[in-house]
């Protein structure tokens, strides 16, 4: 609510906001005390100085994300917002991704430089996707489950900074918010919502990558899975997706043909 009021210069009281939001009356006083607090005002001022943000009511809010279930009310970002208007491929996969993922991405991501690659900046497949995108001159979009000034995992700090400089870094969490377990499924819905197509590289049979793939399917996105060895645990999730109807990603041309529709 604070970001919406600040962004649009609305002259709304805390009580009016609580009523608009249909907040139960027993919580009104607590909400008003928090909303009018000096701490919240200082936090908003700090964000105004150090990051940019976009609310769900603004014209630049990504239309693809707006059409999904439960879009974030506010997106904090660093970088170039215009990359959201380019054809976008999401890449997700195992944190323990093998050399197979890296080799496949080197082959598959030789895409037009108008293409953006979106992932979650986690260890493994996410980091590999961003690294290959940067090597090939594609614009990266990183969606993280922390504040923009936090790094998780810590070893991805330089990569996260490169993504913000060369593309776009996004979070629905304010500054100084550290990683929590439930942040990552929430982050995955943003990845699924922003992309045109989603690629799963390697994934176990019970994997967060499969949750992201299902979210992408619910948002009417095209889902591709990299076929793998039948006796390898990191291929079980992808092979299961293919069995359920995902397109096997056998060559680069499949992605090129798909992206042609979004130019």
Residue ranges of model-derived segments:
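Short, small/acidic-rich helices and loops at N termini and domain boundaries
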Residues: 1-59
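Glycine-biased, small-residue-rich flexible motifs in mid-sequence functional cores and linkers
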Residues: 56-263
């Amino acid at each position: 609510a604070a970001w919406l009021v600040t962004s649009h210069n609305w002259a709304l009281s805390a009580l009016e906001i609580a009523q608009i939001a249909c907040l139960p009356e027993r919580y009104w006083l607590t909400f008003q005390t928090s909303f009018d607090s000096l701490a919240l005002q200082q936090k908003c001022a700090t964000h105004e100085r150090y990051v940019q943000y976009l609310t769900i009511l603004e014209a630049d809010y990504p239309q693809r994300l707006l059409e999904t279930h439960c879009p974030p009310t506010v997106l904090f970002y660093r970088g170039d917002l215009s990359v959201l208007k380019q054809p976008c491929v999401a890449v997700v996969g195992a944190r323990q991704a093998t050399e197979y993922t890296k080799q496949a991405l080197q082959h598959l991501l030789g895409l037009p430089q108008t293409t953006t690659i979106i992932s979650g900046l986690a260890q493994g497949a996410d980091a590999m996707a961003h690294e290959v995108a940067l090597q090939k001159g594609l614009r990266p979009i990183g969606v993280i489950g922390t504040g923009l000034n936090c790094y998780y995992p810590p070893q991805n700090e330089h990569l996260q900074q490169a993504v913000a400089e060369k593309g776009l870094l996004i979070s629905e969490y304010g500054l100084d918010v550290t990683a929590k377990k439930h942040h990552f499924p929430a982050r995955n819905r943003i990845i699924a919502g922003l992309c045109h197509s989603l690629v799963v590289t390697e994934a176990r049979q019970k994997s967060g990558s499969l949750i992201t793939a299902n979210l992408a399917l619910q948002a009417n996105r095209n889902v591709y899975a990299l076929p793998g060895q039948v006796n390898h645990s990191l291929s079980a999730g992808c092979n299961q997706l293919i069995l359920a109807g995902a397109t096997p990603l056998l060559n680069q041309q499949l992605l090129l043909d798909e992206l042609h529709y979004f130019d």
